[in-house]
UniProtKB/Swiss-Prot annotation:
Physiological role: Nucleotide-binding protein.
UniProt entry keywords in alphabetical sequence: Nucleotide-binding
GO MF annotations in UniProt: nucleotide binding
Pfam families membership: DUF520 (PF04461)
GO cellular component, one term: cytosol
Entry's family note: Belongs to the YajQ family.
Signal peptide: none
InterPro entries: DUF520 (IPR007551), UPF0234-like_C (IPR035571), UPF0234_N (IPR035570), YajQ-like_sf (IPR036183)
Protein name, per record: Nucleotide-binding protein Asuc_2113
Top-level taxonomy: Bacteria, Pseudomonadati, Pseudomonadota, Gammaproteobacteria, Pasteurellales
Length: 163
C-alpha cells in the first residue's frame, strides 16, 4: 500500500548560512553603524539569539534574519519568535527557537483534518512525524494538498513516498 510521512524539519546548515548572511547584511546597514548588534546561532539548543541596543533595532534585526531565512528556503513560520524581549543592562535580546519535528498536539490536528476530509487513508502518529497510508496514490496526493492548504502554523515536508 502506498504511504508517505509528514515531517517538519529544518536543515541546520541552511540556518547557519542564513545567520551568516544576516550578519553580513547587518554589517553593511547604515542604521547599525557603531551599534552593538549580534545574531548568533546555537546549533545544540536549536536557537538563534538576536541582541542589540534598542527594542526598535531588535525588531529590525529580526526582519533581517527572517529575510535571510526566506532567501535560504527556510519558512518564516519555523521560527518561534517570543513576543517579549529580555533586557540586560543596555542590551535587548530575543531567543528565537527553531521548530523541529511535529508536536503531538499539531499531529493530532493533522490526523483530525485528514479524517474529517473522508478520504480513504489511515494516519499514524510516529514520534515527531505522521505516517499516511492509503490504497491509491490519488488519495495520498489529495492529503498532501489538504495539509499544504491548512494553516497549522508550521511548515511541513512530505517524504518517504512509497508505492
Amino acid at each position: 500500500m502506498p504511504s508517505f510521512d509528514i515531517v517538519s524539519e529544518i536543515t541546520m546548515h541552511e540556518v547557519n548560512n542564513a545567520v551568516e548572511n544576516a550578519n553580513r547584511a547587518l554589517s553593511s546597514r547604515y542604521d547599525f553603524r557603531g551599534v552593538e548588534a549580534v545574531i548568533e546561532l546555537n546549533e545544540k539548543n536549536e536557537t538563534v539569539k538576536v541582541t542589540t541596543e534598542s527594542d526598535f533595532q531588535l525588531e529590525q534585526l529580526i526582519e533581517i534574519l527572517i529575510g535571510a531565512c526566506v532567501k535560504r528556503g527556510i519558512d518564516s513560520t519555523s521560527l518561534d519568535i517570543p513576543a517579549e524581549s529580555e533586557h540586560h543592562g543596555k542590551l535587548y535580546s530575543k531567543e528565537i527557537k527553531l521548530k523541529q519535528g511535529i508536536e503531538t498536539e499539531i499531529a493530532k490536528k493533522i490526523t483530525k483534518l485528514i479524517k474529517d476530509s473522508k478520504l480513504k487513508v489511515q494516519t499514524q502518529i510516529q514520534g515527531e512525524q505522521v505516517r499516511v497510508t492509503g490504497k491509491s496514490r490519488d488519495d495520498l496526493q489529495s492529503v498532501i494538498q489538504l495539509v499544504k492548504g491548512a494553516d497549522l502554523g508550521q511548515p511541513f515536508q512530505f517524504n518517504n513516498f512509497r508505492d
